[in-house]
Each structure stands twice: as C-alpha cells, then as structure tokens.
Amino acid sequence: MTDIFERVKSPFYHFGMLMRLNKIPYEDFKSYITDRLGDVAEQAAHIADEILAFTSCHPYYTQQLSFAVWNNLVAGKYEDVLQLAIEDIITTHDLDYERLWLNFNKTDKYVMVSICEGNNPAQDRNQPTSTMTSALLRLSKKGYIIRSDRYEIEDPFFRKWILKNMIE
C-alpha cells in the first residue's frame, strides 16, 4: 500500500509526509462504537466487541465494518448483523480480491492460505526456507501481511474471502 508513495514512478511519490497510524486502543474504540450503535442496537457493547475482534482494532477496517453493521441495523436487519455486514463487504470486494489473488504467484498463495489457517510459514518445512522468507518479505512489503507476534493478513475481509473461496 505504501508503494504508491515510495515508488519513484508513482504520481504520488513523496506526495506528503508518510505517517504510519497505530491501532486505536481497544477500550477507546469500543466506547466510541458502543456510543454510536447505542441508538440502533440493544446490545451495542457486544456488537462493538465482535467488530473489534474481527478487525483487530485496525482503524480503517473497523470503520468499514461498523458502518456496514450500522446500515444493516438501521435497515431493520438484526439477525446475525455482524456476519451479514462481513458478507456484504466481502461480496462488494469479491472481484477486487479475485483479481488480487490471480496476480499472486503460487508461493504467495501458499503463504497466504497458510497464514489464514493459523500457521507460521516461516516455520514451514514443506517448502525451502529461502522461498518462504522471500515470499513473506515480498507480501509484507506490498502490505498484504503484517507481523506482530505472528504473521497476519492485513485485511480481515480478504482473510475471510481466502478462507471461504480458496480453502477446500
């Protein structure tokens, strides 16, 4: 994602100061979401917990999911409101995810599926270590995966799409 600001041939190269945003603290985010959903949902705190668990407090994905949940609640859809919102977002981005997936090489796909299944590709002994390391670095640099205490798919909706469509 940062490529568009760091690649010399990009029209956005050094467009402005690049700022990396940290995750918003859980309790602050929960309080904010609970307040906003309080007018349309009886169990706003529970829904906020579910949203934050799914997005891991990532600001963009939390905002996206919260908005979809809110829209569903306002439309009178109360049953499985979180899953419905997740499915709506995945359906909206289905072609984008498919196009993205088709541009990955075989190793990158293997790594992405492995991460989705909760495995650590760096410790995978079915593939050469150098191959796994190269793939992890490449996917990290492109912003598809992040590493905290373990590797994770950055976009929780893409992770869910992979689990739904690519794992048999």
Which residues fall in each region the model found?
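Short loop-to-helix capping motifs
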Residues: 57-58, 155
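Winged-helix-like regulatory helical subdomains adjacent to P-loop NTPase cores
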Residues: 57, 63-129
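Helix-loop-helix "sensor" segment of P-loop NTPases
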Residues: 1-53, 74-77
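Conserved RecA-like P-loop NTPase ATPase core
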Residues: 21, 111, 155
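Short amphipathic alpha-helical interaction segments
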Residues: 125-142, 146-148, 152
